Amino acid sequence: MIIEPKMRGFICLTSHPTGCEQNVINQINYVKSKGVINGPKKVLVIGASTGFGLASRITSAFGSNAATIGVFFEKPAQEGKPGSPGWYNTVAFQNEAKKAGIYAKSINGDAFSTEVKQKTIDLIKADLGQVDLVIYSLASPVRTNPVTGVTHRSVLKPIGGAFSNKTVDFHTGNVSTVTIEPANEEDVTNTVAVMGGEDWGMWMDAMLEAGVLAEGATTVAYSYIGPALTEAVYRKGTIGRAKDHLEASAATITDKLKSVKGKAYVSVNKALVTQASSAIPVIPLYISLLYKVMKAEGIHEGCIEQIQRLYADRLYTGKAIPTDEQGRIRIDDWEMREDVQANVAALWEQVTSENVSDISDLKGYKNDFLNLFGFAVNKVDYLADVNENVTIEGLV
């Protein structure tokens, strides 16, 4: 079939297999161009099919020649409807790993469930014995707690009072004021249950108990802080409470990993265009301005540049891993530079529907958004007939 982007609000309902494949190949080529990282050898990536999780899997495999197991929840094509982008990303990753002679297997299912944890542990035991790195990069809006059976839904709301600020419809370039009503206590509890560190802890407990963590194993989860500009809706809102919980969980997990001399870290990453960030009011406008400033400074990074730098300059230097006072790894350091933030704040004051195309990188934002779904990718013929029914090699 010929596949075109179909939009509904902040979601693209279609994805392109060839575009997703080219995206993955581009990321692999970037990692290879940066040279070998003396990194992990056996890696589990929980949330391995898109964004930072996919970038972690690619960096592990093609930067350090690591065997990887990826866990995700994606949909194959059905009756004239393409599969999800993460499905096609994984098809491409598995094919490229096979060509390179690198072990890679994948599990498609609910990572929050006990069954998927057990299936993953069984696969590690059978094929790898143990893993030396566990990346935790889940981005789901809903979680059913396997112990209580309660289904929690996360919300993106401020805490303590309504919040009003500028936002942009990145499809039209219309800049307007948005007001978000505050969260109640239940909203906070649910968001922490979905996006906090409880499930990360459950994964590490299960793996420790099963003996599948190698001595000196590291686990890393991803977080975001961001500037004062976005804090009401992000870091001081419901999602920020979840990130606080995630960051606190790193210390708890590190305590438990002492028996294998392991350590848990949270890496604070930069703001990027993802399906999740596109749905948060205010954030797309902030990112469009940030991109403009960082590109002008020559310090713009996407997911793969961020994670390659995390591995090469932070995790695997052979020296102690540098962290902030809270023990967090900071690869948002370029985004949070004083000059960068001052420039973004100045542009924020000026931005309107009339000048947004000139003073922000809305074009780059849109392009990155379409790229998530395999569209607007260079070297791809979108008029060509494409087979949407492709299977994932190495799916367990």
Curated annotation (Swiss-Prot):
Q: Does the keyword Disulfide bond apply?
A: no
Catalytic activities: a 2,3-saturated acyl-[ACP] + NAD(+) = a (2E)-enoyl-[ACP] + NADH + H(+)
What are the residue positions of the site described as Plays an important role in discriminating NADH against NADPH? 74
UniProt-listed Enzyme Commission number(s): 1.3.1.9
Query: Where do the annotations place substrate binding?
Result: 224
Q: Where is the active site?
A: 234
Any one biological process term the GO annotation gives: fatty acid biosynthetic process
Q: Name one GO molecular function term.
A: trans-2-enoyl-CoA reductase (NADH) activity
**Binding-site list for NAD(+):** 47-52, 73-74, 110-111, 138-139, 243, 272-274
Biochemical pathway = Lipid metabolism; fatty acid biosynthesis
Enzyme class per UniProt: oxidoreductase
Q: Which UniProt keywords apply?
A: Fatty acid biosynthesis, Fatty acid metabolism, Lipid biosynthesis, Lipid metabolism, NAD, Oxidoreductase
Q: How does it assemble?
A: Monomer.
Q: Which PANTHER family match?
A: ENOYL-[ACYL-CARRIER-PROTEIN] REDUCTASE [NADH]
Function of the molecule:
Involved in the final reduction of the elongation cycle of fatty acid synthesis (FAS II). Catalyzes the reduction of a carbon-carbon double bond in an enoyl moiety that is covalently linked to an acyl carrier protein (ACP).
Q: Which family does it belong to?
A: Belongs to the TER reductase family.
- What this protein is called in its record is Enoyl-[acyl-carrier-protein] reductase [NADH]
